[in-house]
């Protein structure tokens, strides 16, 4: 792993050359190490199994009402431009037998967000993992995010927000269930 980090640091120095900066100037001397260290966290989702994040579940047949955790802040990196996108995710599910601690839902968002990603895929991955591990009656995930690839380059639209949703099980079949979830996350 150390050899990979050294090679990556040299790659960062090559980027300085490519953009026309001086790799030897004082402000850039430690930048390659800092970039590699920051990438350890930014891309830490590759080292985690999302199913294990939800691994501790509680069997609770009495809980059959909607569970919602909203406004889970996240940041991710666009797989097309390697620029950040960030925003909030809201998750809802209706347990069948299993519930999970709410911090696990936030960690599930993080594990998928900390990968090169597109928002549409991330939203679906969160919902699919909930369905696989918790086997609820249904799940719904809504993500809202600002994409720096649209803010800093391309069309340069600073106020645009992308909204994606993933709808599974009862949420997909029953409009009232979707409406209840949307009512919870609007307030």
Curated annotation (Swiss-Prot):
Q: Where does Zn(2+) bind?
A: 78, 81, 149
Pfam families assigned to the protein according to its UniProt record, in alphabetical order: GTP_cyclohydroI (PF01227)
What GO MF terms are annotated? GTP binding; GTP cyclohydrolase I activity; zinc ion binding
InterPro entries per the UniProt record, alphabetical: GTP-CH-I_C/QueF (IPR043133), GTP-CH-I_N (IPR043134), GTP_CycHdrlase_I (IPR001474), GTP_CycHdrlase_I_CS (IPR018234), GTP_CycHdrlase_I_dom (IPR020602)
Q: Name one GO cellular component term.
A: cytoplasm
Q: Does the keyword Transport apply?
A: no
Q: Which PROSITE patterns match?
A: GTP_CYCLOHYDROL_1_1, GTP_CYCLOHYDROL_1_2
Q: Catalysed reaction(s)?
A: GTP + H2O = 7,8-dihydroneopterin 3'-triphosphate + formate + H(+)
Pathway(s) it belongs to? Cofactor biosynthesis; 7,8-dihydroneopterin triphosphate biosynthesis; 7,8-dihydroneopterin triphosphate from GTP: step 1/1
Q: Which UniProt keywords apply?
A: GTP-binding, Hydrolase, Metal-binding, Nucleotide-binding, One-carbon metabolism, Zinc
Q: Record's superkingdom?
A: Bacteria
Q: Which GO annotations describe the biological process of this protein?
A: one-carbon metabolic process; tetrahydrobiopterin biosynthetic process; tetrahydrofolate biosynthetic process
| Protein EC | 3.5.4.16
The record ties this protein, via HAMAP family, to: FolE (MF_00223)
NCBIfam families attached to this UniProt entry: folE, PRK09347.1-2, PRK09347.1-3
Q: How does it assemble?
A: Toroid-shaped homodecamer, composed of two pentamers of five dimers.
Family assignment from sequence similarity: Belongs to the GTP cyclohydrolase I family.
> Protein name, please?
GTP cyclohydrolase 1
Taxonomic lineage per UniProt?
A: Bacteria, Pseudomonadati, Campylobacterota, Epsilonproteobacteria, Campylobacterales
């Amino acid at each position: 792993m150390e050899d990979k980090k050294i090679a990556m640091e040299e790659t960062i120095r090559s980027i300085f050359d490519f953009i026309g900066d001086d790799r030897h100037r004082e402000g850039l001397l430690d930048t390659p190490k800092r970039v590699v260290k920051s990438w350890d966290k930014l891309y830490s989702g590759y080292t985690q199994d999302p199913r294990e994040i939800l691994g501790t579940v509680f069997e609770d047949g009495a809980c059959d009402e909607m569970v919602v955790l909203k406004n889970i802040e996240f940041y991710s990196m666009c797989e097309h431009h390697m620029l950040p996108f960030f925003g909030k995710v809201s998750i809802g599910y209706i347990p069948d037998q299993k519930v999970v601690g709410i911090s696990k839902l936030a960690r599930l968002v993080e594990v998928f967000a900390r990968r090169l990603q597109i928002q549409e895929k991330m939203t679906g991955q969160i919902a699919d993992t909930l369905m696989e591990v918790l086997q609820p009656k249904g799940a719904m995930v809504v993500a809202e995010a600002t994409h720096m690839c649209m803010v800093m380059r391309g069309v340069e639209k600073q106020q645009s927000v992308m909204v994606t949703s993933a709808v599974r099980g009862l949420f997909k079949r029953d409009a009232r269930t979707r409406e209840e979830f949307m009512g919870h996350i609007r307030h």
